[in-house]
Amino acid sequence: MSGMPNAELVREQQQPGDPMGSSAHPNAYVPEVGGLGSELPEAPRDKFFRKMREQPLVPIGSLLTCGALIAASNHLRSGNRDQFNKALRWRVGFQGLTVLAALVGSFYYGQQAAATIPAPASSSADAPLQQGAVTTLPGRAPTVWQQTRADERANKGRNEFEGRVGQALDRELNDDKRLEEALLGKEEEINLEQLKKTATKPRPVIGQDARRQV
C-alpha cells in the first residue's frame, strides 16, 4: 500500500509522447540546454567579415547605390537634368541587384546552416542521438513530442530571421524613396527659380526703341 502513491506520481509526471516516463530522470532536458549554452557567441567583428566573405555582392551593391546617389545630387546641382535622371535609373538598378543578392544569400546560407547542424560524438552508447537535433539520455531515441518541439523552435527562429531581413529591406527602400523625393523636390524648386528669373526680365517691344523713351 505504501508504493501506490509513488506509482500514481510517476504516471502524473510522464510527459506526452514519452512511454517510459521522465520522473526517474528529472534532468532529461539539461543536456540540450547545456549544449546550446556551451557555444560561445560570435564576435561582431568576426561576424562582419564572415558576412562580407559570404555575400560580397551586398556591400558592393550598396557602394554602387551610394555612388549613383552622389552622382545624381551632383548633376542636380549643376542643372543637368538628363544626367540626373540617368543616375537615378542606375541607382534603382544597383539597389535591385543588392536586394536580390541579399535575399538569395540569406536563403542559400540559411539552408546550408540548417543542413549542417553539428551532431554529437557518435558512439555505441548514444547512437540513437543521430536521428535528430534533439539530445536525450544515452541509449534513448527522441520522442515525438521532443522532435516536434525542436521543429517548432527551428521554424520560429527562421521566421524571426526572415522578418528582420524584410523589415531592414523595407526601411532601406523607404529611406531611398524619401531621398529620391527630396532630390526631385529640390530639382522642381530650381526649375521654378529659373522660370521666375526669366519671367522678371523685360521683353523688348518690336518696333519700339527704348533709347528714345523719356
Curated annotation (Swiss-Prot):
A UniProt-annotated Pfam family: HIG_1_N
Keywords on record: Coiled coil, Membrane, Mitochondrion, Transmembrane, Transmembrane helix
GO cellular component, as recorded: mitochondrial membrane; mitochondrion
Cell inner membrane among keywords: no
Bilayer-spanning residue ranges: 57-73, 88-109
Biological process (GO), any one: mitochondrial respirasome assembly
Bilayer topology annotation: Multi-pass membrane protein
Keyword Coiled coil belongs to the record: yes
HIG1 domain sequence ranges: 29-120
Coiled coil location: 177-197
Matching PROSITE patterns: HIG1 (PS51503)
Region (Disordered): 1-36, 195-214
Major subcellular site: mitochondrion
Compartment(s) where it occurs, according to its Swiss-Prot or TrEMBL record: Mitochondrion membrane
Domain of life: Eukaryota
Subunit and partners: Associates with the respiratory chain complex III/complex IV supercomplex.
Family: Belongs to the RCF1 family.
Role: Cytochrome c oxidase subunit which plays a role in assembly of respiratory supercomplexes.
Protein name, as recorded: Respiratory supercomplex factor 1, mitochondrial
Organism: Mycosarcoma maydis (Corn smut fungus)
